[in-house]
């Protein structure tokens, strides 16, 4: 299934899964989060996920390298500072956190696989191909970075 590698932008996958999560949210069973404060959990996750994604994008812009997930070969510099000291993929992490918050807001058991499916898809069809390209482009420097910083957290 290599033909899916680097084909669909992760934000589109997140939106599609979010719509799917919403679509199945009326199916039982439902769960009660923190005495019906699921909206607060969702808000914290959405703001947190958005902030993580924003900080990651700002860091890449400051380094004057590509923000396009479909073109990792256009990367001009290996960014290992800022939020990239803790996660090699903070933009995808932010989307996963936001999807998790949306699942909490929906309070529907059938929406829970959404964030998991996002992580599985992005790991296989986005991150692994990116890692191959970055390894070829930056060699030992990238290999050292991967040993020091985890893929997600």
What are the roles of these predicted feature ranges?
Residues 1-81, 93-153:
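Membrane-anchoring alpha-helices and their flanking helix-loop junctions
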Residues 84:
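Solvent-exposed interhelical
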Residues 89:
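Extended, alpha-helix-rich binding/interface surfaces that flank or overlap catalytic cores
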């Amino acid at each position: 299934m290599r033909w899916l590698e680097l084909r669909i932008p992760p934000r589109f996958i997140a939106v599609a899964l979010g719509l799917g999560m919403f679509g199945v949210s009326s199916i039982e069973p439902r769960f009660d989060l923190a005495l019906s404060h699921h909206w607060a959990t969702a808000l914290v996750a959405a703001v947190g996920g958005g902030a993580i994604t924003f900080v990651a994008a700002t860091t890449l812009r400051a380094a004057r390298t590509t923000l396009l997930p479909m073109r990792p070969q256009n990367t001009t510099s290996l960014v290992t500072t800022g939020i990239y000291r803790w996660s090699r993929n903070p933009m995808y992490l932010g989307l996963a956190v936001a999807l998790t918050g949306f699942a909490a807001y929906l309070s529907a058991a059938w929406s829970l696989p959404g964030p998991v499916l996002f992580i599985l898809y992005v790991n296989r069809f986005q991150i692994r191909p990116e890692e191959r390209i970055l390894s070829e482009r930056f060699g030992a420097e990238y290999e050292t970075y991967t040993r020091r910083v985890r893929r997600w957290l």
